Structure formats: structure tokens, C-alpha cells
From Swiss-Prot:
Residues in coiled coil: 1-74
GO annotation, biological process: DNA-templated transcription elongation; regulation of DNA-templated transcription elongation
Family the UniProt entry places it in: Belongs to the GreA/GreB family.
Encoding gene per record: gfh1
Gene source species: Thermus aquaticus
Keywords of this entry: Coiled coil, Transcription, Transcription regulation
Protein name stated in the entry: Transcription inhibitor protein Gfh1
Key word Coiled coil present: yes
Keyword Coiled coil: yes
Amino acid sequence: MAREVKLTKAGYERLMKQLEQERERLQEATKILQELMESSDDYDDSGLEAAKQEKARIEARIDSLEDVLSRAVILEEGTGEVIGLGSVVELEDPATGERLSVQVVSPAEASVLENPMKISDASPMGKALLGHRVGDVLSLDTPKGKKEFRVVAIHGR
């Protein structure tokens, strides 16, 4: 049996949008490939080969997204009392007062490019956050070594 993939509602919607975009890209790539095949006298043409590879990459991405979405279980809204999958957490460095906001998500949703950063529950930081409450102080491994953070706020999923 395939393992379920836990997603926030927003994460599920984002992946559905990506799937739509990839399907549109596939249609365009197929059209370009057909045009190249019709106009090419030499089937060893590097442009034709590149188009085939791009189409294959898009198909693989579609397969991957469809697989994740077919196994998706959308998380219910949390209470905000305990950090769990989908929680948005505000952390503060007690030494500097610097604040950091992250959301704990499944590996399928993880992205450091978003705000708040989406941290995988399977990552060291994600594992360290799970189960904590407001006021807890925890030690996290960062690229600059161990750092302490205090949980300032937890917002539900």
C-alpha cells in the first residue's frame, strides 16, 4: 500500500496548480516536438533531442505530482497549542531578540524560498520543533552551530 502524504490545504492547492502548469507545458512541448519532427530531415538533430528530453522531464514531473496528490491527506486545522505538521511557528533567539517564522510541513511541501519558510517535518529542525509549546526553549542545529530559540507563538494550520 502506498504511503500517505500529509499536506496542508494550501500545500495541496499549490501542488494542484503546479500540476496544471506542467500539463500546459506538456502540451506546448508536444507541439514543439511535432513541429521539429515535421521540419527536420535529420533525426539526429540536437534540437529534436533536446525537445524530447524536455518533454520527458515534464512527463516525469507530472507523474511525480500525480503520485503525491493521489496519496494526499489534507490536514485538519490545528489548535495552535502544540507544534505539529502545518503549524506556523514564531521563534525568537533569546540572546539577540532576532525572530524567525517557519511552517512545519511534509517533505513534499518544503521550500525555503517562501515566507514563512516551509520546513520539512523530516528535517532536523522540523523534528526538533514538533511537540513543543509556546514558551519552550529548544536547541537547533544551524549552519553556524547550535542555537537556542524560544517558541513565541504557534498559529494553527
